[in-house]
């Protein structure tokens, strides 16, 4: 696919060639097989990353699911989200991660899942998963009773 005459974020007007899901080239007078779209100098931006979302599934799908949250993200130009761990159950064990990942299969965008730390977290099983980060470590209470004390915080930092 080729997008001609697109205004980039820095104000330059260029052609953008896309191969599959990746930008292949940015320049002038590019050629490509397949669809050609004239952007007519409209702004063309890459997909955004929202590294801090709170999809409430599992535990509270009446508030938001991976499907509804990711649909909203995609509508706003977000192509990757990272969900925070304070759900019910909190994402503090490998089993809880697996449960959340099953829900995330309904996502319409790429995603990452943050792990969390609680007094009963299981770092061995949690950190064996593709956890994006240990996100939102709470020194006060939050959804999922995720508040921890300073000693556990220090231990979590060393394990991560």
Regions found by a protein language model. Give the residues of each.
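Metal-associated gating/positioning segment near the N- to mid-region
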Residues: 42-106
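Structural signal for conserved beta-strand scaffold positions within catalytic alpha/beta enzyme cores
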Residues: 37-38, 83, 113
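Histidine/acidic-residue-rich, glycine-tolerant segments that coordinate divalent metal ions
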Residues: 87-96, 102-160
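Receiver (REC) domain switch-region micro-motif
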Residues: 36, 49, 134
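Divalent metal-coordination and catalytic microenvironments
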Residues: 6, 21, 41, 52, ...
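Short strand->helix junction
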Residues: 9, 55-56, 141
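A generic structural signal for alpha->beta connector loops
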Residues: 33, 78, 108-110
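Histidine-rich, glycine-flanked metal-binding segment
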Residues: 1-46
């Amino acid at each position: 696919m080729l997008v001609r005459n697109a205004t980039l974020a820095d104000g330059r007007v260029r052609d953008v060639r896309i191969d599959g899901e990746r930008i292949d080239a940015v320049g002038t007078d590019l050629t490509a097989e397949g669809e050609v779209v004239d952007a007519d100098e409209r702004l063309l931006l890459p997909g955004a990353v929202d590294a801090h979302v709170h999809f409430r599934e599992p535990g509270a799908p009446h508030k938001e699911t991976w499907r509804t949250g990711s649909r909203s993200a995609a509508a706003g130009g977000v192509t990757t989200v990272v969900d925070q761990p304070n759900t019910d159950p909190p994402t503090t064990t490998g089993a809880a991660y697996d449960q959340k990942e099953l829900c995330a299969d309904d996502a319409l965008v790429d995603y990452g899942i943050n792990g969390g730390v609680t007094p009963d977290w299981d770092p061995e099983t949690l950190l064996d998963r593709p956890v994006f980060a240990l996100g939102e470590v709470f020194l006060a209470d939050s959804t999922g009773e995720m508040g921890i004390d300073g000693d556990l915080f220090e231990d979590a930092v060393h394990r991560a």
